[in-house]
Structures are given as C-alpha cells and as structure tokens.
Amino acid sequence: MEHVLSTHLFVNHRLNTVWLDKILQAGVPAVEIFCARQHLDYRDRAQINELGHWFRASELKLHSLHGPMYSDDVWGRSGPNSHLSITEPVKSKRLLVVDEIKRALDIADVIPFKFLIQHLGVSQEEYDDRKLESAFGALEEISLFARERGVEVLLENIPNQLSSAERLVSFLNQTHLKLNFCLDVGHANMREGVSTAYTIMKGRIRSTHIHDNNGKDDSHLWPLYSEGGTIDWPEAMKLLRTGAGQYPLLLELREYPEFPLPQALATVKTLFEKLETI
C-alpha cells in the first residue's frame, strides 16, 4: 500500500521546508498537510509560495489537505466564531465557513493535491435534519470549487451523530452528492467499530486516517507502540488490504513525549513496515 504521513504529527509547529525534508529523508513518499493556521497558514501567501517552490523541486508528493477546523491559530480558543462547521444553520455564517475552506483549497493553485478531507460537523455534534440541509448546500459549492482545481472532496467519519459510517452513506444517498470517503480507523473504533465502518464505507473509501485510541478519547495514539490502544491491528490491516490500491495507508498521529520530534520520524518508517507485515 502507498504510505502517507499527516503533518498532524507536528501540527503545533509551523510547517516549513525543514520538516518536509525530514519526512522525505525518513523514506515517506507523500504527505497530508493538516490545515491549522499555527501550522499551515493558508492565508499567508509567503508560506504557501515557499512550500510550493520546495514541492516543485522535491520527490515528496502532497497527497491531500485536511480542511481547516478553525479560523484562528489557537484551536478555536479565540471564541465560537472561529469554529468552522459546514452544518452551521445561519446562512451568513455558513457562507463565511465556505469562504474559509475555499481559501485553503486555493493552495492547489500553487501545490497540486488529490483530496480535501472534510468533516461533517464538529466533534460530539447532535443529529439534526436541518444541519444536513446546511451541509448539503455548503458541500455543493465546496465540491464545485474543488473540482475546478483538480481536487476531490472526501467526507471523514468523525465522532458525532452526523458522521457515523451509516449516516455518511445515508447522507450521500439522500443528496446524490458524488462524493467519497476518508475512513478514519481511530474514529471508527470510538463508534461502530472498525470492521462495521469499513464494511459500510468500503466502496467509497479513497483515503484513510490510521491511529489508535482507547475507544473513548480521540487521542491519536501510535498503533502497535502506544499503551492504551484497543484496535485489533492484525484484523484492521487484513480488512484494509482487501482494498489495496484503492487508498493509501495514511498515519495521522499525535506528538507525544515518548516519541520526541524529529526522531519520531524514524519510528514512523518502522511503524509502516510493522503494519504491512502483521
């Protein structure tokens, strides 16, 4: 399977060419960039242009971009208006969210990538038909804007009442949106289970997020290394291999003291090898 690393691993550090060089030197051929403004400020043309110049001269490929979740650089702590959700029921506010996501998509004009990973709502959000109507309108506009730039929008299963595997499939069936999925294995472990989520989503999976947790907390633990993870990785990999070639093995990990940066990148390479051989 193709190996991809999400820059979520060092999302609290500003993304620069030094980090990208280290990823390439670790033997990872492609990345997903996590769009958080303290990490990648999609409004900062200087940062985007610097990275674009580096990518044009590098073998490292930009596989995907994780859509922004907040408009600030402090994980939404500046206030509720900084939270970006396409389920926002107030049209004027939702249009601002769509505009912010479009700003991130503009990166494709400088650094081409295949996929934008998009959340449907926020963590722990309750189900409401009106929220899905809001999301439908937003996704129509975002998808059109993305396609004009050669990008496909993928919906990710996240731990809320709108984005279980079953709800995502139902949403696409009802709206007839021609979208596919990013299967987040860690999030599935917190909801219906990895096997169930995979079975429901498998025909539309185009990318993955691989990480572990205790079934309750979205802690982005390191598979096979971190203590407290509850995913059966031999079984999970057996499932994922049935669709090999349809999607990559994409690690979305968190920085932990036991895996200090940048040395942790060497462990990333070993982790890919372990997952492929279990």
Model segments located where?
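N-terminal pre-domain/capping segments
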Residues: 1-103, 109, 147, 269, ...
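Histidine-acidic metal/acid-base catalytic patches
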Residues: 1-4, 13-27, 162-278
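Active-site-proximal loop/turn and secondary-structure-junction residues that shape catalytic pockets
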Residues: 9-11, 35-37, 67-71, 120-124, ...
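Active-site acidic/histidine proton-transfer and metal-coordination neighborhood
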Residues: 17, 74-180
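Conserved beta-strand positions in the central sheet of alpha/beta enzyme cores
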Residues: 32, 64, 117, 154, ...
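Flexible, glycine- and charge-enriched loops at secondary-structure boundaries
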Residues: 41-44, 48, 87-94, 125-132, ...
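Alpha-helix-loop-beta-strand connector modules within alpha/beta enzyme cores
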Residues: 51-67, 136-148, 174-176, 232-236
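A short helix->loop->beta-strand "cap" motif at the edges of active sites that frequently abuts
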Residues: 58-60, 113-114, 151, 243-248
